[in-house]
Design a protein with these regions (language model features):
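Aromatic "clamp/platform" in nucleotide-sugar-dependent glycosyltransferases that forms part
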Residues: 251
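Conserved donor-binding/catalytic core segment of Leloir-type glycosyltransferases
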Residues: 173-207
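Short hydrophobic beta-strand element within catalytic cores of glycosyltransferases
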Residues: 259, 264, 268-271
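Short alpha-helical donor nucleotide-sugar binding micro-motif in glycosyltransferases
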Residues: 68, 130, 238-243, 324
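Nucleotide-activated donor-binding/catalytic signature segment of Leloir-type glycosyltransferases, i.e.
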Residues: 215-234
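A charged, aromatic-enriched C-terminal amphipathic alpha-helix characteristic of glycosyltransferases
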Residues: 302-337
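Donor nucleotide-sugar binding/catalytic pocket of nucleotide-sugar-dependent glycosyltransferases
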Residues: 124-170
Length: 340
């Protein structure tokens, strides 16, 4: 099958959405499919407000239509709700072609955190974007339930996986800091709720690995915390493995792939009992979910690294890719090319 994936999130961005899509694309190719990823790199772009490191395609509709017509896909997946996602939606609707979408990010909650607008406004925009899709792929049962509450009728559960070869237990001497070492990995932005972690009264050390618009301010506000940026996945894997506990303070993530990567490295998780952590950790003895995040972090130190590793191995990317294929809506008959 010829599969077009349209996404506003792609390399060199470093986030969970990019990792999911890049890994998915590789697995689909391994399964014998032809995959075309259409991303902002092929377009003139402008910086995203509040996220200048994220480029947004500028007026992409015509060029995107030409690219899709030339590729002649058998199925189209719109991975994000940015300019390219809307342009892909317009292309499919103009040709009366089915498509799928994905709900990777709780943009309504991010927008409310920045502007204070009621959640109903951005959720209305999200319903409009995803409404015509044959299926809206969401990464967990919790998010699926939330979308149903907001009036989505076409959402389906599509879990994520982890590369247990890349992320695995390693010696902890990579980091020379007082123990225990409490780690956060990910974007350093307001929606990640990092002050909830960095303000905790914990023994040992707190380490943040990642970059983002809130990094400089948090470094000034929490001078006793340590901040690093990983140079590639191999180094990132060593940071994970060096930790004693992975602290995930976000209340707005749809999944939290970094938790799986930590578990694959044999490191237990402390988090709030919200969507994302509830779906990755559940009732397994590989993490502690508690509204008292400090208590969760201390309790997680007693959990088994081997149990963490075994739990992560349940999340297979091969299964994720095959499930994705089952959700696609292939076109009936050959695609008739149309001028943009």
């Amino acid at each position: 099958m010829r599969i077009a994936i349209v996404t506003d999130a792609w390399h060199p961005q470093r986030n969970g959405v990019v990792r999911v899509l890049a890994t998915l694309g590789g697995k689909l190719v391994e399964l014998g499919h032809t995959v075309e990823v259409i991303d902002p790199g092929a377009f003139a772009t402008i910086p995203c407000p509040s996220y200048p490191e994220i480029p947004l395609a500028l007026a992409p509709r015509r060029r995107l239509a030409r690219m899709l017509d030339a590729f002649a896909p058998d199925a189209v997946h719109l991975a994000t709700e940015g300019p390219l996602g809307w342009a892909g939606r317009a292309w499919a609707l103009a040709r009366d072609l089915p498509f799928t979408t994905a709900y990777h990010t709780k943009f309504p909650h991010y927008i409310r955190a920045r502007t204070g607008v009621p959640l109903s406004w951005p959720y209305g925009v999200m319903r409009r974007f995803h409404g015509p899709a044959g299926a809206v792929l969401c990464p967990s049962a919790s998010v699926h339930a939330e979308l149903k509450e907001w009036g989505f009728t076409n959402a389906v559960e599509w879990s994520h996986g982890v590369d247990t070869t890349a992320f695995h237990p390693q010696p902890k001497d990579f980091i020379d800091l007082p123990r225990p070492l409490f780690l956060y990995v990910g974007r350093v932005a307001v929606e990640k709720n990092l002050p909830a972690f960095l303000s905790l009264d914990l023994p040992g050390s707190k380490l943040v690995v990642g970059d983002g618009p809130a990094r400089a301010g948090l470094m000034r506000r929490f001078p006793r915390a340590h901040f690093r940026i990983a140079n590639g996945d191999a180094e990132l894997a060593r940071y994970y493995a060096a930790a004693d506990c992975f602290v995930f303070p976000s209340r707005t993530d749809t999944f939290g792939l970094v938790m799986l990567e930590s578990l694959a490295a044999g490191v237990p998780v402390a988090a709030f009992p919200v969507s994302g952590p509830r779906d990755v950790i559940g009732d397994a003895a590989v993490g502690v979910l508690d509204e008292d995040l400090g208590r969760a972090a201390m309790a997680a130190l007693d959990l088994s690294p081997m149990a963490c590793r075994i739990h992560a191995q349940r999340f297979s990317w091969d299964a994720v890719a095959r499930q994705f294929l089952g959700f696609l809506r292939p076109f009936k008959g050959a695609l008739t090319k149309m001028s943009a």
